[in-house]
Each structure stands twice: as structure tokens, then as C-alpha cells.
């Protein structure tokens, strides 16, 4: 499994997990976060390996679709980059730095 894809799916899962069904959440979490194989998931839920594979592939598409429409992850990345740039540009402005850190903290609490 590609590390980049795994990281992306884990991140999208963090942002959109609550929009998935329980079954989708379980399979994606076991496969990507807990590194279970398709066979291990199939055995755990007493279904075929192919059924697990199909569900994971559909759920990956669903997660990508949510990101295409809602942009929560991409906006989060851009927002953090902008905050970092502002902190570097104005390191002596303590008021600004504290407010930027508050914004970062809010973002971290949400996700």
C-alpha cells in the first residue's frame, strides 16, 4: 500500500468520518489506520474478501467526493500555511502571534 495514499485516506477519514456509515468507518479504519489486511477484515466481519475490497474502494471514492465538494482538508492545509507565513513575517508582533496561535488551536480542536 502506498504511504501517500494511506496518509491521505487517514486524513480524509479524520475530516469526514462522521459522514460515513458505521460499516464504512469500520472497514476504512481497520484497513488504513490499523493496517489490517482484506482477509483479516473479512474474517472479522464474516464476509468475503471481495466484499471488503469493494466496500473500501467505494468508501475511498466517497471520501474523495466529500473533499471535492467541501474542501475541508485542502482549506485546512492552506489556512495553516497562511498562518505560518504570517507568524514568520511578523515574529515581533506578540498580539498578532497570539491571535494566530488561537486560530491554529481552534483548527486543531476541530480535527
From Swiss-Prot:
Transmembrane segments: none
Coiled coil location: none
The organism's place on the tree of life at top rank: Bacteria
Family matches, as Gene3D superfamilies: Winged helix-like DNA-binding domain superfamily/Winged helix DNA-binding domain
Leader sequence residues: none
Function: Might take part in the signal recognition particle (SRP) pathway. This is inferred from the conservation of its genetic proximity to ftsY/ffh. May be a regulatory protein.
Family assignment from sequence similarity: Belongs to the UPF0122 family.
HAMAP family associated with the record: UPF0122 (MF_00245)
Protein name from the UniProt record: UPF0122 protein llmg_1069
Annotated organism of origin: Lactococcus lactis subsp. cremoris (strain MG1363)
Amino acid at each position: 500500500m502506498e504511504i501517500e495514499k494511506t496518509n491521505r485516506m487517514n486524513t480524509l477519514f479524520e475530516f469526514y468520518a462522521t459522514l460515513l456509515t458505521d460499516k464504512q468507518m469500520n472497514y476504512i479504519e481497520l484497513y488504513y489506520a490499523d493496517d489490517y489486511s482484506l482477509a483479516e477484515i473479512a474474517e472479522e466481519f464474516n464476509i468475503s474478501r471481495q466484499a471488503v475490497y469493494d466496500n473500501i474502494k467505494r468508501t475511498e471514492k466517497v471520501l474523495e467526493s466529500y473533499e471535492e465538494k467541501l474542501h475541508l482538508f485542502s482549506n485546512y492545509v492552506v489556512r495553516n500555511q497562511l498562518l505560518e507565513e504570517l507568524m514568520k513575517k511578523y515574529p515581533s508582533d506578540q498580539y498578532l502571534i497570539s491571535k494566530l496561535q488561537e486560530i491554529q488551536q481552534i483548527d486543531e480542536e476541530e480535527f
